[in-house]
From Swiss-Prot:
The keyword Ribonucleoprotein applies. InterPro entries: Ribosomal_bS16, Ribosomal_bS16_dom_sf. Belongs to the bacterial ribosomal protein bS16 family. GO terms for cellular component: cytoplasm; small ribosomal subunit. GO terms for biological process: translation. Keywords: Ribonucleoprotein, Ribosomal protein. SUPFAM superfamilies: Ribosomal protein S16. This is Small ribosomal subunit protein bS16. HAMAP family: Ribosomal_bS16. Residues 111-123 have a biased composition (Low complexity). It comes from Rhizobium etli (strain CIAT 652). Residues 99-110 have a biased composition (Basic and acidic residues).
Amino acid sequence: MALKIRLARGGSKKRPYYHVVLADARSPRDGRFLENLGSWNPMLAKDDEKRVQLNAERIKHWLDNGAQPTDRVLRFLNEAGVAKREAKNNPIKAKPGKRAQERAAEKAQKAADAAAAAADAAE
């Protein structure tokens, strides 16, 4: 049984409230869970201490027993100092696309041609 530490949505329409729960990965998002581990209220201010509440002791216990947190929960755990979130590394994303590289090469070529023409005119 693969266990996930994830968010289960509660609250009413347009007023979300989430429970941080331990659940089987195959169970529905708001369905059966094994243990309630905390809560997240995105409607509160970001600096409010009640915005994210976690039971760090139980979360550590379940992480040691193989439970996998979802990305959003891992962000909360990283902020609380319970778990370490590795920085994502995508070096390809930093490179411009093919057409942008072509445009940059054309622009550089035009600048070089203009500089050469200016040098010829100065002589």
